Amino acid sequence: MDQNLEMNKKKFFSKILLFGEYGIIKNSKALVIPYKKYYGSLKFSSKLDNVQKDSNINLKQLSKYIKNNEFVSNKINTLKLDSDIENGLYFESTIPESYGLGSSGAVVAAIYESYKQEVGIDLEINDLKLILSNIESFFHGQSSGIDPLSCYVQKPLL
């Protein structure tokens, strides 16, 4: 019997954003609150079902994007990420997609947490937000970084 293994025990929660992403991109303020009803985490399976395969393929595309992004390519261990993807890595999530609840932010936070190059180094919050926004831009074209930052620090942000 195939066993799905969690990569780590950390869950990355969805979020509730008051005042909207577009406003943040245009330098307005917003309040972001972690919403623990929905969450996601990285897992492995040696026999991926269709949903897990889709996630695995999406992670492959994200890894390729990271490697081609000059700003973040040296901040993520893509060799390890690619190896894990080939070994059945996927993102399991209860976060509804396309509703603005932070499904892409949770994926980005999980990837950064698990594959960041600079382990043990505390970055300034704005530096971390910039890294996460660059990675999340894979999903949306332009990201403020507030969604993955909220998922990563798991605290309300203003």
Q: Predicted regions span which residues?
A:
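Conserved acidic
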Residues: 103, 124
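A short glycine/serine-rich beta->alpha loop
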Residues: 92-102, 134-142
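Short amphipathic alpha-helical face segments that pack within enzyme cores
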Residues: 106-113
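ATP-binding N-lobe of GHMP and related small-molecule kinases
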Residues: 2-100, 113, 117-121, 154-156
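Alpha/beta catalytic cores of group-transfer enzymes, especially the acyltransferase/condensing modules
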Residues: 125-158
